[in-house]
Amino acid sequence: MPTVYSSVVLTLDCLGLKKDGVFKAFAEGLKAESWFGNNLDALYDLLTDRENFLTVDLLHWEEADLTEAERFSFEALFEDAAEELAGRLKIRLIAREF
């Protein structure tokens, strides 16, 4: 019998969020507050340790209050996680809505 996967779409508004706020938004959005460690390793695990398809829309990503290094680290993690899940994870960085 083939495996059936569910699909989850998560929308997070990143306007003005600092690094810890981005971690908190993911933890709350994916219901992982009880164990999430507020670091890049925990975020990677949260995104990749799943059976379902996941699409994350990060609204106002460019308006998050992140340093260049923090933004680069998040984006590299998103790319690595999406690559590991081979099509089951999509993260869309949405700068603005009109």
Which residue stretches match the model-derived regions?
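Positively charged, polar, low-complexity stretches
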Residues: M1-F98
